[in-house]
Amino acid sequence: MNGLALLRAGVSPDDRISCGGALRVGNGIFHCHKRSGHGPLNLKQAIMASCDIYFYEMVRRLGYDQVAPVARTLGLGQKFDLPFSTQRYGTVPDSAWKLKKYRAEWTVADSLNASIGQGYVLANPIQLAVMASRIASGRSLQPRIVMNGTAPTANPLPLNPEHLAYIRDAMYGVVNQGGTGGRARLNIPGVSLGAKTGTAQVRRITMAERAGGVRSNASLPFKMRDHALFICFAPVENPRYAAAIVLEHGGHTVTNLDTPGIGRDIITYLLDRDRALKSLAEVEPTWGGDIATRMAAETAAYKSQISLVQGAQTETNATAAPTDAPAVEAATDAANSSAAAIANTAQPAEEGSREATND
């Protein structure tokens, strides 16, 4: 999306930005996900490496008002004609939007945050999938829940076809030429996947933490971990499918369960079901068995936990609840003692008699 906006604004795809890992703007420092930096990058290389500094600097020069219209053209901020009322439009911010909503001027920091999908930018998964489909097809495709009859004709996007082809090639490189999505490479002869990885940060990283070393997602509480994102389409040569995967608080913590692998498996299933199921059978033992086995184990574990909780509650209630049991027990003991005394007085004990037992 940002790449298309840059090309549309006249940026040459061969222009290079040197990434040193951080960019100072005023009193603030904006960091790249690669702390040591990527070095000099052109547009395709920046997309493949998911370099934050490249897009920070380019959008700083142009302003985010050049990017927002392209974002809307690709489906962000849109409500689609779908049969449910729970859609959230998200937000594609710009200077006019901020002035209207907050009565505040747009800042350079706002542009930098928005350039990597942070700050005020909000998007839902279906918008991301639509964006992937429009980049792949070059048309203003609309999502539908049920396929029936002939699909409506989608108009071409008001974007340069050469620019779209360039971005598709860069997304091919993300997966197949050493980019960040290499684990999404398809194992289907003659079929390639184009994609873009992403991360949605959900917490603020302080300067003190950066100085001491940013904590890994795996070391954070679940709710503080980043969301992992992935959009893709395939086949690159003649796209048929597009998808968006959002793994909430996934944080890119488990490689073989990360979004690129999920995207690969979904597309493989759509294009070659037998191959996908064979691959699934090979990997399922590492997850604890097939889906039926895993669900049975989870159900048993859940029931076990419920039993333990109920048992603990029963013991607590029995101990804590007020009761007449001590008084009843004392009265019973007194009555038994009196009866025994009377019996002993009335009749001598027999030799060899034994105490009563419960057999």
Where are these regions (language model features)?
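Beta-lactam-recognizing serine transpeptidase/beta-lactamase-like catalytic domain environment
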Residues: M1-L247, T255, E298-Q310, T314, ...
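Short, gly/Ser/Thr-rich active-site loops of penicillin-recognizing serine hydrolases
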Residues: P152-N155, R168, P260-T332, S337-S338, ...
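Short beta-strands and strand-coil junctions in structured, solvent-facing domains, enriched
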Residues: G251-T253, D272-R273
